[in-house]
Curated annotation (Swiss-Prot):
InterPro entries: TMEM18. It holds the Pfam family TMEM18. This is Transmembrane protein 18. One of its GO terms (molecular function) is DNA binding. The chain crosses the membrane at residues 26-46, 53-73, 92-112. Residues 1-25, 74-91 are perinuclear space. It comes from Rattus norvegicus. The gene is Tmem18. It is a multi-pass membrane protein. Forms homooligomers, independently of the DNA-binding domain.
């Protein structure tokens, strides 16, 4: 008898993936904890530029490897999951693994753009002050 959570033909739509997933599985809870830790590291690394670069690169590499992770998980799903979630299209791995990692990467890029704009603004203000000082010296 099939469980209401069993997936024979994996749905294509995101709401269907969310509804048909058994979110109480330990490996999914562990993945959720991993994503929360990544989000915390993203937030707390804002003042540490080198740490943030390393974190960003790790996120991008993990997203790049998602296809390979999906293939390995599809072959070995019985070792850690109740149901086969890993389809050839990669919808499930994209939703539960790659999307949160890409969100973190996007937050980091937004932080970098904001920081760059702040530095550019500060530089422009400094240039204006220097220009004003030079102008005053010439008037004297």
């Amino acid at each position: 008898m099939a469980s209401p959570y069993s997936v024979r033909v994996f749905p294509v739509s995101i709401p269907a993936v969310i509804m048909e997933t058994d979110w109480t599985e330990p490996w999914l809870l562990g993945l959720l904890a991993f994503h929360l830790l990544c989000l915390l590291l993203t937030c707390f690394s804002a003042q540490r530029y080198k740490l943030q670069i390393g974190h960003f690169l790790c996120l991008v590499v993990l997203v790049y490897c998602a296809e390979y992770i999906n293939e390995v998980a599809a072959m070995n799903w019985r070792l850690f999951a109740k149901y086969q979630y890993f389809d050839s299209r990669g919808m499930f791995i994209s939703l539960v693994f790659s999307a949160p990692l890409l969100f973190n990467a996007m937050v980091i890029v937004i932080m970098w753009v904001r920081k760059t704009l702040t530095v550019m603004s500060d530089l422009k203000n400094l240039q204006e002050r220097r220009k004003e000082r030079k102008r005053r010296r010439k008037e004297e």
